[in-house]
Amino acid sequence: YRLTYYTPDYQVAETDILAAFRMTPQPGVPAEECGAAVAAESSTGTWTTVWTDGLTQLDRYKGRCYDLEPVPGETNQYIAYVAYPIDLFEEGSVTNLLTSIVGNVFGFKALRALRLEDLRIPPAYVKTFWGPPHGIQVERDRLNKYGRPLLGCTIKPKLGLSAKNYGRAVYECLRGGLDFTKDDENVNSQSFMRWRDRFLFCAEAIYKAQSETGEVKGHYLNATAGTVEEMYKRAAFAAQLGVPIIMHDYLTGGFTANTSLAMYCRDNGLLLHIHRAMHAVIDRQRYHGIHFRVLAKTLRMSGGDHLHSGTVVGKLEGEREVTLGFVDLMRDAYVEKDRSRGIYFTQDWCGMGGTIPVASGGIHVWHMPALTEIFGDDACLQFGGGTLGHPWGNAPGAVANRVASEACVQARNEGRDLSREGGDVIREACKWSPEL
């Protein structure tokens, strides 16, 4: 492999798709051979020379390992940079992109471990994707909510409620001041609550809360299903009800289904909330798998208006700088290379709409100052137990979250330092909000 696929003098083309792999070779295997093997197995190579190699322009189509750098503080571990010609990939297909780059190479015998840390998607390839159904600005215009983070709540217990009781919980949360409530990722259409019943009772709750508060409300109706045809049926029913947003579990549902659903949502005026169920199976290991920043980039290309991104401060894992790195990759139009935040390549999104990061998992009102400071306005903060665990009930829990959020936003706008004064801001708000 090394003679053909390791090319340290290669000049990267503007149209190349670039990958950064964290690579741990087996003992005794040279890093150059491993890097070349990764490039070969994820592009044109196989385990031996075949006569049909002579029938193609190998130099035009092969992947190239063009740089290797040792990982500081680790023994026998390298970052391998691989460049892939754009012609290797089908236009507008995240499925084909991932099948090529990570589909086969991770089981390679010469490697102890392999992790895809980052991808550079060139403008020429970015422009073949539709991206999010609507994007951040269109969502704010449709909801008529500006200048603050959006607030949500996952209805608990996640399984076992009847549709009517579920709808009641949705209504209480929305009436109290939240913008959204959410189906949990494993709420689909079980025997205790069929999807059509849930959609109807949740729509009733949304319209009742809207009429009482004068604000646009939404509930992430999970359209994920066992078949794409059934998923379309659920999305179509949501559109008929006139609700603003539906939801999809994009990793368990698959990228092909997700891209199809995103196109349906764009055509039918639905926002699309994306849950990342199963992500930790892929991204939690430090040395093997795919980093979540890659999953976030590919989701933005496939299509999603919201994506769960970790909290930095709650019950789930997430390092602050690294989390902020992929949050920027979800939201911003142009992101510079910054290795301190785990961003290996400069990424130009060419005007593609942004995806709102969703902070969810073990957060409550005392986290509000930190969340406001870390995520800024273009985020959705979701408090499940932090709303429903209020001793007075769901609606007072929602009131407490809304009051805390608006107090933190006002304090920030007045120039106060939320990292130092956050506790004082919440205590001051408590004086005039008994729910908080």
UniProtKB/Swiss-Prot annotation:
Pfam families: RuBisCO_large, RuBisCO_large_N
The UniProt record lists the keyword Amino-acid biosynthesis: no
Gene3D superfamilies referenced in this protein's UniProt entry, alphabetically: Ribulose bisphosphate carboxylase, large subunit, C-terminal domain, RuBisCO large subunit, N-terminal domain
Location (main, coarse): plastid
Alphabetically ordered keywords of this record: Calvin cycle, Carbon dioxide fixation, Chloroplast, Lyase, Magnesium, Metal-binding, Monooxygenase, Oxidoreductase, Photorespiration, Photosynthesis, Plastid
GO biological process, one term: photorespiration
Location of N6-carboxylysine modifications: K182
Swiss-Prot/TrEMBL catalytic activity: 2 (2R)-3-phosphoglycerate + 2 H(+) = D-ribulose 1,5-bisphosphate + CO2 + H2O; D-ribulose 1,5-bisphosphate + O2 = 2-phosphoglycolate + (2R)-3-phosphoglycerate + 2 H(+)
Database matches in SUPFAM superfamilies: RuBisCo, C-terminal domain, RuBisCO, large subunit, small (N-terminal) domain
Active site: K156, H275
Site (Transition state stabilizer): K315
Compartment annotation: Plastid, Chloroplast
GO cellular component, one term: chloroplast
Cofactor (UniProt): Mg(2+)
PANTHER family, per database record: RIBULOSE BISPHOSPHATE CARBOXYLASE, RIBULOSE BISPHOSPHATE CARBOXYLASE LARGE CHAIN
Known role: RuBisCO catalyzes two reactions: the carboxylation of D-ribulose 1,5-bisphosphate, the primary event in carbon dioxide fixation, as well as the oxidative fragmentation of the pentose substrate in the photorespiration process. Both reactions occur simultaneously and in competition at the same active site.
Family matches, as HAMAP family: RuBisCO_L_type1
Note: The basic functional RuBisCO is composed of a large chain homodimer in a 'head-to-tail' conformation. In form I RuBisCO this homodimer is arranged in a barrel-like tetramer with the small subunits forming a tetrameric 'cap' on each end of the 'barrel'.
Listed name of the protein: Ribulose bisphosphate carboxylase large chain
